[in-house]
Amino acid sequence: MPNDLLKEYKNAWDKYDDKQLKEVFALGDRFKNFISNCKTERECVTELIKTAEKSGYRNIEDILAKGETLKEGDKVYANNRGKGLIMFLIGKEPLYTGFKILGAHIDSPRLDLKQNPLYEDTDLAMLETHYYGGIKKYQWVTLPLAIHGVIVKKDGTIVNVCVGEDDNDPVFGVSDILVHLASEQLEKKASKVIEGEDLNILIGSIPLKDGEEKQKVKHNIMKILNEKYDISEEDFVSAELEIVPAGKARDYGFDRSMVMGYGQDDRICAYTSFEAMLEMKNAKKTCITILVDKEEVGSIGATGMQSKFFENTVADIMSLCGDYDELKLRKALYNSEMLSSDVSAAFDPNYPNVMEKRNSAYLGKGIVFNKYTGSRGKSGCNDANPEYIAELRRILSKESVNWQTAELGKVDQGGGGTIAYILAEYGMQVIDCGVALLNMHAPWEISSKADIYETKNGYSAFLNN
């Protein structure tokens, strides 16, 4: 019987020679560095713009202000309020023939501070939080946490905050009941063991010695913050402060084959998309990489995929190329092809019952395609067309990229969604495609370095073909 009659998704580690192994681990190190230093959307955008500019990308606002035009080979980026980024490499073909698009998100599940967060209770200073995205709340207690973000004062001054990452920094955390007194707590459903209103951060316990103030611990904390950041309590109202796991991403496993780190959903696909884009020197079709905010809460708002920022920026690009009208814009979007660069769930041998083995993703077997996501009867899904999938199979086979297909768990087990359906509304071809993770949405997620490498190569192959 011919060997090609049956399908087998092979382990990517088996094919690497010494040169490729060095590339795999080097990419893993770059990715670890990125997610260790970029734990918020703003931090991601700031860092990626610095790197992009070194590779020749220019801010579209500067180009518009100078009245310049664009031509084949030009590299442009657009910054959406410091929390979203779109990159363009102008191709040879007319823009109305369509784009090659990679799209990932750079927001991740976390705890956000409320607008009036600071209070004192029994001589302890605390911060109120509101969790962001889908989390198992019990996973966020008794962990060392860091505070990242910005405080914007009334005069418009932006104060950057990052506390808990340096070895000399303090860390913070959410406490839990000692097991000796937890009999009632342990009888609760896992979803109720820790309630949302229980996710309060302990930040101090020393009372202010001087004065007659009643809330002396709270007052002392504000004194420290005022001395360090020149802020008052009211400035929390116009702050965007995110509570995230403290510490760097680490190698995982004796063989260092995996990465453990916070925010891999979806910065792992954002980073591999970014690297694939930087590798492009010229293109037949114009290439676009979209990195957006707010995917974890429905892609809404000014910095989410549902905003008009992407469409408006594409219109600007077409105008700068001297090729804009409304009909051409619509044709360009309709004729485009996109990889919705988002993570998938890896099969976990500790929890096999939620997955269907024949349609699951596995660590080490390469980039994962999810033909559809959604839940129950494919509700809310983007269901990719088979003609498009066949084209992608051809491209990846040609470039020797390891790939696999998967669903997000068993039928009726649950489900999820991405930004794919939003771009598909333009009529373009879209499929979800990214890295499989263990511990998805937990404070510390796990990925395979082989999958990171194959995903970056898969994105590069897509852009180049």
Curated annotation (Swiss-Prot):
| Name assigned to this protein | Probable M18 family aminopeptidase 1
What organism is listed for this UniProt entry? Clostridium acetobutylicum (strain ATCC 824 / DSM 792 / JCM 1419 / IAM 19013 / LMG 5710 / NBRC 13948 / NRRL B-527 / VKM B-1787 / 2291 / W)
Q: What is its EC number?
A: 3.4.11.-
Q: Which InterPro entries match?
A: M18_aminopeptidase_1, Peptidase_M18, Peptidase_M18_dom2
Q: Which SUPFAM superfamilies match?
A: Aminopeptidase/glucanase lid domain, Zn-dependent exopeptidases
Q: Which cofactor does it need?
A: Zn(2+)
Isomerase as a keyword of this entry, yes or no, is no
Taken from the record, one Pfam family name reads: Peptidase_M18
